[in-house]
Amino acid sequence: MDLSFKPEHETFRDEVRKFLKDELTEELLEAGKLTASVFSEVEFSSKWHKILYKKGWIGASWPEEYGGTGWDDMQRYIFRSECASAGTPSPTAMGLAMVGPVLMKHGTQKQKDFYLPRILSGEDFWCQGYSEPGSGSDLASLQCKAVRDGDHYLVNGTKIWTTH
């Protein structure tokens, strides 16, 4: 098995390194260092997300038909590896890694057309809010309710762990 980079992958790695050098401000690098989990603080995640979106690099694992990069496996590896080495903050991951792929597979065409571009651009922000006092993440015992109130929903309840 040959795991060496092809010349086009070396060129791509150089491009990624230059991009990171040019775009990573001290503020973003500091935010990357302070990341306590897989998620960076929202302010910095959003900034980094928008920089990647402007470059056309936010949808690294999304199919091209939904606005993804069209990168091969090696390019995705190079990009993620270089971002990790550089200490970037994470982009807003919930929409990119969880909501977007579910919509791609199970969403209606109308949902895909509306939400997927907004996830990529960072215009829409998604989060997960499962855990509740006394329930943890046991989804069958959750007490929080959403009730339609005109053209929106009123959500009542308490969450103890929410992530973006």
What are these regions (language model features)?
Residues 1-13:
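Intrinsic disorder at enzyme termini
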Residues 9, 20, 56, 63, ...:
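Buried hydrophobic positions in well-ordered alpha/beta secondary-structure cores of metabolic enzymes
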Residues 18-24, 52-54:
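N-terminal glycine-rich anion-binding loops that anchor highly charged ligand groups
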Residues 28, 90-96, 126-132:
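Core alpha/beta catalytic barrel or barrel-like domain that forms the active/cofactor pocket
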Residues 28-52:
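Short secondary-structure junction/hinge motifs that connect adjacent elements
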Residues 32-41, 64-68, 99-105, 131-134:
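Conserved short loop/turn motifs at secondary-structure junctions
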Residues 46-123, 164:
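Internal helix-loop-helix
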Residues 68-69, 110-164:
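Glycine-rich, Trp-frequent "lid" loop and neighboring beta-strands that shape
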